[in-house]
């Protein structure tokens, strides 16, 4: 009996504990990312931001959570009630399960699979389904228009993201995220320099993927009265909100893994190796999240035609050209990795 426990049940308990160890801190990070956003934007606009609930306003996310928890969930009369309830759950769950393959430090990853890149691309692509279902199930023209915009926007920028990741795969020769980080430890500086423009394109593309300014067309308040989640209240709205910010942290972690060396120190200096890799990972993700907030505070929203033109007429040709350029340079310099 004891052998059966250690062979079948104990591994499941360990996996469950790992999931809890990732999920609970992530939800806390999402809650306080909203606080950080309001404080940072407040400072940039010469005001104080939240400062009443608790010392320095630190209890504001808890107050917001309690408020949303006790609000009445209102379901529109002519909506598809089952899909209306499922849509925010789908969005929130997909924003969490992408973390299964992200390496936080050397050996610290929930599932170190050989096709981690394909897994995370698939999960990031599926997140649009929650938004489309919400727009259709709400039976509202504003919500439906926001959902259509979101699907068109994500399809447009998913292509560029995929091509950018191909350039990373060409230089690293693996689909395993932990191995991609370790390859960057010994990667020549000129390859890093060659991938830098693709890192910028990738970051702009994930801005569009997460529907953040200047690409927040699916939830444009001035045009669509909040877009796809206009009919949601209470925990439905809260789950969409949590899903959006969890996706922000996830794509920042993806950018860190692909282009910033993940948990590796930023410079190849011996004493920097004494600092735990988890610290460097959190520092890099935090920097990218600050860039998200900085962009929101400073840039206006794109027009829809400008958004589509940037995706199809600028990023798509540029990333295609860069894939050819990177592969040609790697073949010419005999640096193409063996797979």
UniProtKB/Swiss-Prot annotation:
Topological category with respect to the lipid bilayer: Multi-pass membrane protein
InterPro entries: NADH_UbQ_OxRdtase_su1/FPO, NADH_UbQ_OxRdtase_su1_CS
GO terms of biological process kind: aerobic respiration
Listed GO CC annotations: plasma membrane
Reaction catalysed by this enzyme: a quinone + NADH + 5 H(+)(in) = a quinol + NAD(+) + 4 H(+)(out)
TM region(s), chain numbering: 9-29, 50-70, 82-102, 115-135, 161-181, 187-207, 235-255, 275-295, 311-331
Main location group: membrane
A Pfam short name: NADHdh
Record keywords, A-Z: Cell membrane, Membrane, NAD, Quinone, Translocase, Transmembrane, Transmembrane helix, Ubiquinone
GO molecular function: NADH dehydrogenase activity; oxidoreductase activity, acting on NAD(P)H, quinone or similar compound as acceptor; quinone binding
Subunit structure: NDH-1 is composed of 14 different subunits. Subunits NuoA, H, J, K, L, M, N constitute the membrane sector of the complex.
Protein role: NDH-1 shuttles electrons from NADH, via FMN and iron-sulfur (Fe-S) centers, to quinones in the respiratory chain. The immediate electron acceptor for the enzyme in this species is believed to be ubiquinone. Couples the redox reaction to proton translocation (for every two electrons transferred, four hydrogen ions are translocated across the cytoplasmic membrane), and thus conserves the redox energy in a proton gradient. This subunit may bind ubiquinone.
Recorded family membership: Belongs to the complex I subunit 1 family.
Name of the protein: NADH-quinone oxidoreductase subunit H
The organism of origin for this protein: Rickettsia africae (strain ESF-5)
Gene: nuoH
